[in-house]
Amino acid sequence: MPKKGKKPKLPLTDEEQLILFQQKLLADEEAAKKKERLLTQFLKDKLAKEEHNSSLNLNKINTQWRTVLREVKTRELHKDIEILSQIFERVVDCKDSVIKSLARDLTEAEEQYAHALRGHLHNVDQLLTLQRRRLSLLEENYNMELEVLTKEFETERKAILDHHDKEIHYLHDVFMAMEQNYVDSEYESKLEFQSMWDDLKNKNLEEKHFLRLQLENVVEDLWRRFQDALKNYTDATEDRKIAFETLKVKDEKSSKEIEVQMKKIQRLQEAISALKGKIVAHSREGEWQNQCIRNDKELVHVQLRKLKIQRTQARTESQENLVKLTLESNATLKALKKVVEKGEKILKLAEICRKFETEEEKVLPFYSSALTPEEQEEVEIQSQEEITEDLAKIMMDYLGMENFWKRYNKVKLEVLSLQHRRLQLLDISSKLREMLKQYLDGISVSDEVLSRLNPLFIVNHKSNLPQLPPSAAQPGGDRGPGGDRRLTYNVIEAAHIASHIL
């Protein structure tokens, strides 16, 4: 078949070209976006892969680094543990030494406490003994004074009872005499009253009979008048009668009360008379007692004056003693202050010197006795001698300082020993310096060396030592061929001597 020919392209219009251009731009833009998305996705994948690889590598590095760090840290920890173990051992040693020193201090403190306790108990026993003696003396004095007071009381009581019995008998006799006088006077009064009563009775009867006869008529007339007056009076004074009856009743009551009061007055008069008698008796007794009291008062005044004089003397003595005591107490306080300051200084020095103590001194701070058996026997013989009480008290006061003086004497001996050793070393040092100087002078040449005598210095076979005469220089040397003695010198080098000495 014949090929179909291509249709000829028709020319595009502007709009179609514009549309085609826009489609092309869109296709290019879409391709660019797709390419960008692919590139972005590739970069993201690559970044994720790199991050994954970096994390793996980091984990590997961290694992290996941890191993290295563990090893380094292990070595450091081993070193630290060794250092800490050494420090711990050193601290333990220090603590052990501190514990030992504290144990020794505790033992010393316990010994000092036991010693102080023994001293305190001994002092308490002495005080108790002294108090018992004082109480026994006071009890004896009290019993003696009680016995004296009892005797005085019994004597005074007996005298008072005797005086009381005498007064009772006297009052009884007086009472009996007064009663007898009263009975006699009463009997006489009754007889006189009876005679007077009879006389008056007879006289009254006679007068009554005469008056009856004389007054019968008058009475009748008066009776009539009285009846009239009575009637008039009764009528006029009925109210007054009632008031009179009331007053009469009151008068009876008052009379009864007066009678009762009279009886009371009589009883009171009797009591007053009895009390007057008692007052007289008591006044006599009181006068006697007042006289005794006056005498006692005079004695008390005399004793009071004596006591005032004694009190004045005692006050003067006490003031003088107080002044002396004040002066002595001030001096004692100053001395004690100095002692306390000295003790504090000793304690401070002891604390400073404690770190310089050796192990032996820390273990055995108090040395044992260094006396020989013979010296120990002499000390025992001297201690067996009689000791006075004052010396015993002084020894008891200074017994607590025994350990202190032991250490003090030990240190004093060590100081003396070190001073002696120092003098020896100074002597040796001076000798060595002298020998060294001689040696240096022998090997060196100077004006000072040339001016001194030196057996080692020889110039042109000549020494600067003076030549001795033959008789003095050759006392026992060998004789020469001509009969003269030859001079012999022993020369020893100073360095050789110094090496042997050092």
From Swiss-Prot:
InterPro entries attached to this UniProt entry: DRC1/2_N (IPR039505), DRC1/DRC2 (IPR039750)
Annotated compartments: Cytoplasm, Cytoskeleton, Flagellum basal body; Cell projection, Cilium, Flagellum; Cytoplasm, Cytoskeleton, Flagellum axoneme
Subunit structure, interactors included: Component of the nexin-dynein regulatory complex (N-DRC). Interacts with DRC1.
Keywords annotated in UniProt: Cell projection, Cilium, Coiled coil, Cytoplasm, Cytoskeleton, Flagellum
Family: Belongs to the DRC2 family.
Statement: the UniProt record of this protein carries the keyword Repressor: no
BP GO terms, sorted: axonemal dynein complex assembly; cilium assembly; cilium-dependent cell motility; regulation of cilium movement
Name of the coding gene: Ccdc65
Signal sequence annotation: none
Residue stretches in coiled coil: 96-160, 252-285
Pfam families: NYD-SP28
Gene Ontology cellular component list: axonemal dynein complex; axoneme; ciliary basal body; motile cilium
Job description of the protein: Component of the nexin-dynein regulatory complex (N-DRC), a key regulator of ciliary/flagellar motility which maintains the alignment and integrity of the distal axoneme and regulates microtubule sliding in motile axonemes. Plays a critical role in the assembly of N-DRC and also stabilizes the assembly of multiple inner dynein arms and radial spokes. Coassembles with DRC1 to form a central scaffold needed for assembly of the N-DRC and its attachment to the outer doublet microtubules.
Name of the protein in question: Dynein regulatory complex subunit 2
Keyword Transcription: no
Annotated organism of origin: Rattus norvegicus (Rat)
